[in-house]
Amino acid sequence: MVRLGQVMYLHKDAYEEYAKRHAELWPEMKTALKKYGATNYSIFLNKLTGQTFAYLEVPDEATYNEIAETDICKKWWKYMEPLMDTNEDNSPVTTDLQEVFHLD
């Protein structure tokens, strides 16, 4: 299992709406996440900076990254775009983090 961590960047006035939309995650998006291997997925918010920290585990990154090509993922990105920093394709601007410690 591969452990992934990344930072994303929310707009200051979007914290509550971001949390609300994730609390109401579309069933189709949840199914896609699981289909492409995501497990133990959590997102944390730093209200002082607007940064989120996402953590998830996947069997392999290549399979998980294929989710970006699905219609449901692209629809979710468009839905979330007003709330966060995004790229031209509406995907969130992210910073991948390097794991430096793990304790089982």
From Swiss-Prot:
Signal peptide: none annotated. One of its GO terms (biological process) is rhamnose catabolic process. One of its GO terms (molecular function) is L-rhamnose mutarotase activity. Pathway: Carbohydrate metabolism; L-rhamnose metabolism. It catalyses: alpha-L-rhamnose = beta-L-rhamnose. Keywords: Carbohydrate metabolism, Cytoplasm, Isomerase, Rhamnose metabolism. It holds the Pfam family rhaM. GO terms for cellular component: cytoplasm. Its EC number is 5.1.3.32. The active site is at 22 (proton donor). Substrate binds at residues 18, 41, 76-77. SUPFAM superfamilies: Dimeric alpha+beta barrel. It comes from the Bacteria. PANTHER family: L-RHAMNOSE MUTAROTASE. Belongs to the rhamnose mutarotase family. Homodimer. This is L-rhamnose mutarotase. It comes from Lactiplantibacillus plantarum (strain ATCC BAA-793 / NCIMB 8826 / WCFS1) (Lactobacillus plantarum).
